């Protein structure tokens, strides 16, 4: 199942999620609203324990319980142009821009943990589009949406070698 770390502002869960304070916020604790494809959305802040719990509950209820056993964490680059976005890391308020790889890692870990809890007797297999050091513990990655061409093969080979040097053997 392909899932994203952003919740559209038109999503039925959005208003309740704002009240639960699970999003990346500005200095005034208001959710940052970003352009997300052709809609607007807010990004879930996986440095917040309540956001991780919210995520895992939704993944379990709406995805895993419907028979899916693999989570594809997509669009988790956390490309925030908003410079006033803040997250909480180790009880300190920090600019989210400094935690971008961590957000992807924590999202992927939250998905992997929910899957492992729901399916304790199968080996977890997850996919992620983004992530930093340690991501290979929770999911494999892929090098993006390619086309069938020599050009794509050339760049995919280079990217694959770089990923392998970073400890990511599946790409």
What are the residue ranges of the model-derived segments?
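Catalytic-domain carbohydrate-binding cleft regions of carbohydrate-active enzymes
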Residues: 1-171
């Amino acid at each position: 199942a392909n899932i994203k770390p952003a919740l559209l502002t038109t999503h039925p869960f959005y208003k309740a999620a704002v009240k639960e304070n699970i999003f990346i916020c500005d200095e005034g604790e208001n959710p940052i609203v970003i352009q997300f494809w052709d809609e607007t959305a807010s990004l879930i802040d996986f440095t917040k324990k309540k956001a991780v719990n919210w995520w895992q509950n939704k993944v379990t209820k709406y995805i895993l319980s419907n028979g899916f056993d693999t989570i594809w964490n997509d669009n988790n680059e956390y490309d925030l142009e908003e410079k006033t976005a803040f997250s909480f890391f180790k009880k300190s308020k920090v600019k989210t821009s400094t935690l971008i790889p961590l957000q992807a890692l924590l999202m992927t870990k939250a998905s992997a943990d929910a899957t492992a809890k729901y399916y304790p007797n199968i080996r977890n297999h997850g996919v992620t589009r983004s992530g930093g050091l340690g991501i290979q513990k929770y999911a494999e990655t892929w090098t993006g949406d390619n086309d069938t061409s020599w050009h794509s093969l050339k760049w995919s080979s280079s990217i694959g070698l770089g990923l392998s040097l970073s400890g990511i053997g599946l790409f």
